[in-house]
């Protein structure tokens, strides 16, 4: 089904650490130049595109960070597997919104699209690490009854991360 879990994914078996080391070599390419990789049917190509953005993000100025964030959110249809979300959402979406209005997180959670919903909750891992739990708890409450196990697992994971840090 269109937009379904791993729809049309082809795996070639490249380990994540290898993909990550390749990504670091392309930290200075224009963010737009990785879009063909993000559109590829091969899962590891899409992962490489996202890991390039993840590697670029901390080295980027405000303008470039906004471009990466905007490209990420306008291509969520290609970020369609749990590992693609989990290895990128908090480092791009979470980091970008850290000192901004978090409304985009709530829009993603309400989108009805599985992967955008997972992006919304996983992005809050950035804030959990800084002992800011409000967004996570709000989104967890909204998504807790989600019918898909991939959302339930992400919510459980983030709540567990909150529990590790909130000893109150």
Name the predicted role of every residue range:
Residues 1-168:
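Alpha-helical scaffold domains
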């Amino acid at each position: 089904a269109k937009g379904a879990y791993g729809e049309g994914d082809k795996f070639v078996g490249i380990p994540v650490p290898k993909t990550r080391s390749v990504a670091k070599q392309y930290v200075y390419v224009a963010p737009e130049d990785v879009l063909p990789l993000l559109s590829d049917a091969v899962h590891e190509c899409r992962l490489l595109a996202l890991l390039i953005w993840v590697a670029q993000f901390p080295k980027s100025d405000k303008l470039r960070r906004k471009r990466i964030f905007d490209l990420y959110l306008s291509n969520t249809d290609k970020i369609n597997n749990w590992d693609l979300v989990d290895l990128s959402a908090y480092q791009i979406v979470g980091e970008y919104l850290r000192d901004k209005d978090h409304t985009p997180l709530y829009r993603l959670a309400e989108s009805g699209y599985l992967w955008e919903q997972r992006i919304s909750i996983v992005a809050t891992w950035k804030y959990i690490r800084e002992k800011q739990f409000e967004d996570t708890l709000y989104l967890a409450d909204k998504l807790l009854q989600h019918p898909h196990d991939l959302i339930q697992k992400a919510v459980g994971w983030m709540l567990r991360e909150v529990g590790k840090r909130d000893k109150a």
